[in-house]
């Protein structure tokens, strides 16, 4: 349910952009993101760190977009967000020696540390690459293409990366025979 709520501001942004323009879509994104966070808070009594980061970036970059009437700000938000996520993953691994991915998913599955490190590094790289791709699409292609990329391209890349991670993890998961022996 929480993941479904994460898509609502994106859907509203896309719809309002197609019906109006980037500025109306930015205002709608700001309002629906704030509303989304209120709903998540009421339902779960907690906001994840990623929700706080997203809220601050959407409101900050959205406000600058509207105040300066310059769409570059909202376009930069995607890159800044993914650079922050990628950096957090790499800092957790290389500075603190505790991969953030393991902290997030370690209760769900048991994997060797080397596997957690590879997954953590790969997702950090993924976020940095999507951020870089966003810069190219946002500033060298028309805004309409950027909006489509932001909504569908990033989602598609995320699904492919998740699928590849799942395939990679699968060979390290215990089989039923191993679980029966324990």
From Swiss-Prot:
Localisation: Cell inner membrane
GO cellular component: plasma membrane
Top-rank taxon, per record: Bacteria
Transmembrane segments: 22-42, 53-73, 76-96, 121-141, 149-169
Bilayer disposition of the protein: Multi-pass membrane protein
Keywords, in A-Z order: Cell inner membrane, Cell membrane, Membrane, Transmembrane, Transmembrane helix
One Pfam family hit: IspA
This protein's record includes keyword Transit peptide: no
Family, similarity comment: Belongs to the YciB family.
Function: Plays a role in cell envelope biogenesis, maintenance of cell envelope integrity and membrane homeostasis.
Protein name: Inner membrane-spanning protein YciB
Species: Tolumonas auensis (strain DSM 9187 / NBRC 110442 / TA 4)
């Amino acid at each position: 349910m929480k993941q479904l709520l994460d898509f609502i501001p994106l859907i509203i942004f896309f719809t309002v952009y197609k019906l109006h323009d980037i500025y109306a879509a930015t205002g709608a994104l700001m309002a629906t993101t704030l509303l989304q966070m209120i709903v998540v808070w009421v339902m779960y009594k907690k906001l994840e760190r990623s929700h706080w980061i997203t809220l601050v970036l959407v409101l900050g970059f959205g406000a600058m977009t509207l105040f300066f009437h310059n769409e570059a700000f909202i376009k930069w938000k995607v890159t800044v967000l993914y650079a922050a996520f990628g950096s957090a993953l790499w800092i957790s691994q290389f500075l603190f020696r505790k991969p953030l991915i393991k902290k997030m998913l370690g209760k769900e599955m048991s994997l060797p540390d080397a596997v957690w490190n590879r997954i953590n590094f790969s997702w950090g790289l993924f976020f940095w690459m999507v951020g870089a791709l966003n810069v190219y699409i946002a500033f060298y292609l028309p805004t309409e293409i950027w909006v489509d990329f932001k909504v569908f391209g990033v989602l598609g890349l995320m699904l492919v990366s998740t699928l590849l991670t799942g395939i990679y993890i699968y060979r390290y998961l215990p089989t039923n025979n191993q679980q029966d022996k324990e």
